[in-house]
């Protein structure tokens, strides 16, 4: 699915809402228990919900209380994602290439491993391509490398 939006934060917020709804209605996660796994060093926007799972204290400071329901793992480590998955995991939300503090490219096998893990555990995989998509890496989307 592709979500065309006016802003990256709006797209990420919609993806969060959609994945939570899917978890409650389809995966049968108990109400208000859905979790989304995110990677450290992320930048998905500056809304109140999005800064709740930011690892940048400058983005989070003085804006609490923060929105619950997010689990942070090490970027580029598929094994940390698999360890974090539980019955309440709705989705994994990651950037194929992180771009907030320079260009951080994960190991070549990272995204294929994450895809397999998500499929194995019935978890949605959300890729935020706002900074890396639409030909910026030489392919239409960065996940295609």
What residues fall within each predicted segment?
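Conserved N-terminal phosphate-binding loop of PLP-dependent enzymes in the Aspartate aminotransferase
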Residues: 1-145
